[in-house]
Amino acid sequence: MLDIGRPVKKPLLDDMMALARMKLVFNHNIENTSSHKELSHTAVLDVLITIEYNPRSELAREHQEEMVASHMRTAFSIPHHRSMYMDSGYPSEPFLAEAASRQMHRYGSPYMVWILRDYIRHGLADLGQKGDMVMRFFLRIAYIEAIVAEQGSTDPNFSKGCNFLTFLKALFAEGFHASVLGCQPDNNVAPPSALADMFKHAVVRFTHFARGASGCTMTTRGMVMAFLRGAAIIGQKDEKTLDIAIPILLDEKHKIEETSMSAFLIQVKRRHHASVVNAYPIDANKLGFFPKGSPADARPYVTLVAELGVKEPPSGMDHLVISQRCKRGSAHNVSQLQSKIPRNVDATERPRYGLRAFTCSDRVWKVVDPRQVEMYEQMLGVDTLLTAHPRQTEESLQLVRQMLPYWYHQPAWFSDEVTTGSPVSSNEFYEDPELNQGEGSGAEDDMQVGSPKLEESTVFEPEAKV
C-alpha cells in the first residue's frame, strides 16, 4: 500500500525494506553477497521454505540459537527444564518474507541449492522431511521466476503476486506447457474446459510457507487468510493426503473472499519405485476443502502428486502425466501423457485438474539446473548402496553382497559356487532391499521408507536405510 501511496512514503518503504534485509543477513552491505556468512544464506532460505531441523543434532540447535540472536529468528518458548533446546522459528511475517525474497533474488537460486544440500547431507535437517523441503524449494524458485517474468528483474515486488498460468510455466519444463495448460478435468465434469481457460485470470501470491496447526487451514476459508498474508500452507507432519496447499484467487478482479478461492493441492512422495497411476488421489470434497453443505459451484482446483524419489517414470509414461477423464461404455486412446485412472461421473463434482510428476530432474521441472540434477538426487536419497557403487559389473556387485551389508532371502555364501559345488544364479536370491523402499503412504513414507518384510526363508533383515 505504501508503494502506491504518496511519493514521500516510497523512500520510507525502501529504507524499511533495506533495514529488514540487513537485519536478516546480519550484514550492512546487502548487495556484497561475498561478505555474507553461510548462516545468512540459511536464514533467508529458512524464511522462504521453512527448513525442518533435525531435533537430535546439536549443531542444528546451535545454528537456530545463533539465528535467534542475529538473524531475526523468533524464540517462541523455552521449555520449563531450560535445557537442550528452545522452540524457535520464523513466523508468518509478510514484510520479512518480502525482504527474504528480494535477498534470495540477489543471491540466485543455484547457490541456495548448495545450502539446502549441505544441511541435508550433514544431518542438520530432518531427513524424514527432505522430500517436502525440496518440493517447497522448487515452488519458491518457480514463484520468483514467474514474478521476474511479469515484472522484470529490476526491483521486483514479490508480494504483488503473479498469474497462475505464468507460475505453472515457470515450474514445469517447456515441453509440457501445452499438455498442462490444455488438460481437461479428470472427474468427468460437464462441460469440460481446458485448464488455461478456467485459470486465465487466476492469481497466486505466496512469499513464504506457514505450517497449518489443524485441518481448518486446509479449506477455502483458510486460503483467504493465507492469500492475504502471502503464504502457502504446509500440512501437518502426520497428514497422509495433502502436504502443501497454495491459495489461488480465481479472478483478480473479484473480492478476496471464500467464494473466490481455490488452491493448488500438492502431495509429495519420496519412494524409490513409482506407484500405480491411480495411487494417492487428492479429492478436495473428501478433504473438506470446500464448505460442507454448500451447493456445488464451478470452482476448479489443481492437484499434483510429485514422486521425486524415482529415477525414471513407469514404463510407457512420460515424466509428467496428465490425468485423463474416461467415458463410460466406450473405448479411448491413452497417450504416454495420459493416465488410465477410471473416474465416476458426478454432476455435482467440481472440476479437478490432476497432474503427476516423476523424478527430480530438469526433464520435468524447469526450475532444476541440468548440472544440479545429481545434487537433488543425493538430497533425496535416490541412490542406493548398490546403484551408487562405482563398478556396476555383476562380479563387483556380488563381491559387495558377499560382505553382507544386508541379510537377503538367502545369504551370499549359500549361492557361492565354492560352498554349493555348482554355480547358482545370484539373481535367484539377491534382491536389494533399498530398491523396494516406500510401501507406506503419507508422512510414514518419509520417516521410515519401506521397512523390509520378514519372510519364512529370512533369518533376519534389518531396516533399509533412509
Question: Whereabouts are the PLM-identified features?
Answer:
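Charge-enriched interaction surfaces
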Residues: 1-466
